[in-house]
């Protein structure tokens, strides 16, 4: 009895949330603006089809081709991820699937019949809102106007020769030539007696819709009166059908296969992962988002990992320390430590962004660290309340001051970059020497009323100067016998923001490999707010520098605290060690010679 051949839907997709997490990562780090098709893979257990459709499961590992497995077959698909939601919406879905159907037809005509089964996903990833839009299709095609009829059908036993032989083949489609299973190549299709197909459907006498793909290719390669297909299934419903094809007179291709959404409509699906994700993880990814977007187009070679992995030590948790830490966070730095010996005063919160009114009276370093964690929970931040020993300030409590020195040195050893952000000039001396001794990056920022200085200290390689290289006197006590306006940092409020941002930008630029994608890395930047002007300049190291002189470095390395204690009690010992004393003596001697006039010398005027 002749009857029309009906077809069951071909597939159903199951997209795990891990797939979208991996898509987010690949989009940010690898794909960027590249919207070319990307390969996807899913594994099919050909002996375990339990539903009436093929289950296409996509997970985080679907972007990598799995290893071959004799029990499974790898089905390759493709992802087309659009860069904007408008492109996703405006994609002509009918034209898209028609083009893909035409491609699959050509593969079947030229290569192997197994290549006519594939799937395609179009998508858009909103990485800021963690919302993903997607639509999957498995093209099934036929000649426009074609009809299919079954003229005979019979059940195939699961233990039949053809079933047993086909199970051993790790394919979905094969040919039978002289009773032997063969590959479904174009040449074999022209001479085979029948085609064997691992059917996805379990409906009685109703095969999967991709059967149309088989019949279309086969009829084009080998026109004949009837076509015999063995639909082998994992249950007892396997059957063999003899089919008549009427392709009609229309040569164009008719393609269908878009998946219906949860409401049973032909429309895209969407998933919002924000509610499923840990808020801390969302924040962690969001911080990196804008940074990684730099690599898409503006600065593709920027080294973000080098910045992220840099451990920053901020000596001073005042106005500069607060702003420097915020800019470091914005650049993705994950390890920031604070050092300060003071507490939050009532004048601080309006100028120092990490403190509130409720923090007044509490230790600055600790509160700054806690505030940073509230802003970004993934940051590794600690606060240390210690007093940095100051050259020229005699020792008053040797036990405590020695502990502070040792703690400071340990902190400098364990960090990559040291920011000097303190008020007093003499506070910067010991960290400068320790930074040079342990070969650390040292960034200095200092404020005037309407000016600022940002500089990076030199090292043995670049021979650039440090904060003290222009001095002919070692720093001494600058805090005693000072009026209030001399003891407080009196500066225009905006100066600190300018200096802090440029200090971090100087570091970030310095960390980049050569050639530097962010531009030049100056030695020092001087800003003048009264003229709204900045000047970049470079100065060489000074051999008699009180902080960078080799004798001073060696003395600290060999004697440690004993040398520091001596420098605290008498700053002139550093001048002698560095050679500054001799420079001063020579200058005084030269000055005396210039003004050494004899009594007989006369000034001539006229």
From Swiss-Prot:
Instruction: Provide the protein's localization.
Output: Cytoplasm; Preautophagosomal structure
* Phenotype seen when the gene is deleted: Impairs the formation of preautophagosomal structures.
The active site of this protein is located at 488 (glycyl thioester intermediate)
Give the domain of life: Eukaryota
Q: What else is known?
A: Kluyveromyces marxianus proteins are shorter in length and have a more ordered secondary structure than their S.cerevisiae counterparts, which might contribute to the superior thermotolerance and solubility. K.marxianus could be therefore useful as a new model organism for further elucidation of the molecular details of autophagy.
Question: NCBIfam families, alphabetically?
Answer: E1_like_apg7
Identification of the protein by name: Ubiquitin-like modifier-activating enzyme ATG7
Q: Which organism is it from?
A: Kluyveromyces marxianus (strain DMKU3-1042 / BCC 29191 / NBRC 104275) (Yeast)
């Amino acid at each position: 009895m002749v009857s029309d051949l009906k077809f069951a839907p071909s597939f159903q997709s199951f997209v795990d949330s891990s797939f979208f997490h991996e898509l987010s990562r690949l989009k940010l780090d690898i794909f960027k603006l590249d919207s070319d098709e990307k390969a996807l893979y899913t594994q099919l257990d050909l002996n375990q089809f339990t539903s009436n459709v093929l289950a296409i499961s996509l997970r985080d590992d679907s972007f990598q081709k799995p290893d071959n497995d004799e029990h499974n077959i790898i089905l390759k698909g493709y992802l087309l991820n659009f860069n904007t939601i408008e492109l996703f919406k405006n994609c002509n879905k009918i034209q898209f699937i028609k083009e893909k159907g035409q491609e699959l037809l050509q593969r079947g005509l030229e290569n192997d019949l197994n290549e006519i089964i594939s799937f395609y996903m179009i998508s858009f990833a909103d990485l800021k809102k963690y919302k993903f839009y997607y639509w999957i299709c498995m093209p099934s095609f036929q000649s426009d106007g074609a009809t299919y009829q079954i003229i005979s059908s019979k059940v195939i036993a699961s233990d039949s020769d053809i079933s047993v032989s086909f199970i051993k083949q790790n394919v979905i489609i094969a040919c039978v030539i002289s009773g032997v299973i063969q590959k479904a190549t174009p040449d074999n299709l022209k001479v085979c007696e029948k085609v064997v197909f691992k059917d996805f459907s379990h409906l009685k006498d109703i095969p999967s819709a991709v059967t149309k793909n088989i019949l279309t290719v086969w009829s084009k390669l080998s026109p004949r009166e009837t076509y015999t297909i063995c639909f082998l299934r994992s249950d007892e419903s396997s059957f063999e059908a003899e089919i008549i094809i009427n392709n009609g007179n229309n040569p164009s291709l008719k393609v269908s296969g878009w998946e219906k959404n949860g409401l049973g409509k032909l429309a895209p699906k969407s998933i919002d992962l924000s509610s499923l994700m840990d808020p801390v993880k969302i924040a962690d990814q969001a911080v990196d988002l804008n940074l990684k977007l730099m690599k898409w187009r503006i600065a593709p070679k920027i080294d973000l990992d080098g910045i992220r992995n840099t451990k920053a030590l901020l000596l001073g948790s005042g106005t500069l320390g607060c702003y420097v830490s915020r800019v470091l966070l914005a650049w993705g730095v994950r390890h920031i430590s604070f050092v300060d010996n003071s507490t939050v005063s009532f004048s601080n919160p309006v100028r120092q962004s990490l403190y509130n009114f409720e923090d007044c009276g509490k230790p600055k370093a600790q509160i700054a660290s806690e505030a940073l964690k509230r802003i970004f929970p993934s940051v590794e931040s600690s606060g240390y309340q210690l007093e940095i020993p100051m050259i020229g300030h005699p020792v008053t409590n040797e036990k405590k001051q020695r502990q502070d020195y040792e703690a400071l040195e340990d902190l400098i050893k364990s960090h990559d970059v040291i920011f000097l952000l303190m008020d007093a000039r003499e506070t910067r001396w010991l960290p400068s020497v320790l930074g040079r001794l342990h070969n650390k990056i040292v960034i200095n920022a200092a404020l005037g009323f309407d000016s600022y200085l940002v500089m990076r200290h030199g090292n043995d390689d670049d021979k650039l100067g440090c904060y003290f290289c222009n001095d002919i006197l070692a720093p001494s006590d600058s805090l005693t016998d000072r009026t209030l306006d001399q003891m407080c940092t009196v500066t225009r409020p905006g100066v600190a923001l300018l200096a802090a941002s440029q200090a971090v930008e100087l570091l970030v630029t310095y960390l980049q490999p050569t050639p530097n994608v962010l531009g030049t890395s100056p030695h020092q930047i001087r800003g003048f707010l009264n003229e709204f002007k900045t000047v970049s300049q470079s100065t060489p190291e000074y051999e008699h520098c009180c902080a960078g002189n080799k004798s001073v470095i060696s003395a600290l390395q060999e004697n440690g605290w004993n040398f520091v204690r001596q420098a605290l009690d008498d700053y002139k010992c550093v001048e002698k060690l560095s050679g500054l004393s001799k420079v001063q003596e020579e200058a005084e001697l030269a000055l005396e010679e210039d003004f050494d006039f004899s009594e007989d010398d006369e000034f001539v005027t006229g």
